[in-house]
Amino acid sequence: MDEIIKSTDNRYSEYETLLFLRDKLRKEAYAWKNRYLAEFGNLITAVFEQKIACIKKKKTISFCQMAVNRGKPVDQAELQNYLSQEMKEYNRKLSEMIQENEIAHSGEIISEETAAKIKKLYYRLAKQIHPDMNPKTNERPELKELWQRIVVSYRANDLEELEEAEILVNKFLVDHHLDGNEIKIQDIDTKIEKLKEHIQKIKETNPYQYRFLLQDQEAVQNKKRELQKELEEYRVYEQELDQLLEQMMKNGVSFLWRMN
């Protein structure tokens, strides 16, 4: 049977400390990601957009060549359907990148006082309903939804939203007689080790590692030059593909247009 540790145990204090450290690092990683996108997002998006333009033209050339090999005209409707399917995932990813980039560029800087209030309030709420500390949260859909709201607000530095969430959390706990209950954690030693591993992984990977790049202005400028170079290479490549398509047209590739 798994050992059950009550919230008064010293190992619980260690577990709680590690849990808050992991969440703090997650938030910092999220902030570094936004700073990275604020710095490089426009160029990264432009590079990817140019890349998928080249992919689309390569697929167009391939489709046309297959029609030529069969001795048939290129069916324009079939070509558009083919490209629509083939490019769907690329376009979805591009839309996602554009959205993330917009969010990163719209970020507001908060005061140290507000940051301290957010941290204190988050820790207070986490002690009440963090799913890794209070099993009741995953058992109650309302609490689970409130916790997700808290996580989003914490990462977004939204103090007002956190304050509203605290009111709702306290009301729910009182209404359902869940306030003041002693929290019990099963198999806490294993969970402590997993938390330590997770913390180390966050520290050693992106987006947390972006901080080393962003704190080095020379590295930032080098990164921008690399992205600009990549963008220019894709632009040149697109021109080459345009010339290839134009040559195919000159060599007699014909298109079949269907009238509605």
Model regions and ranges:
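Short pre-active-site segment immediately N-terminal to the catalytic Zn-binding motif
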Residues: 110-117
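Short "pre-J" leader segments immediately N-terminal to J/J-like domains in DnaJ-family
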Residues: 1-110, 153-260
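The canonical J-domain HPD catalytic loop and its flanking helix-turn segment that engages Hsp70
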Residues: 102-106, 120-139
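Short alpha-helical basic/polar micro-motif
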Residues: 41, 119-120
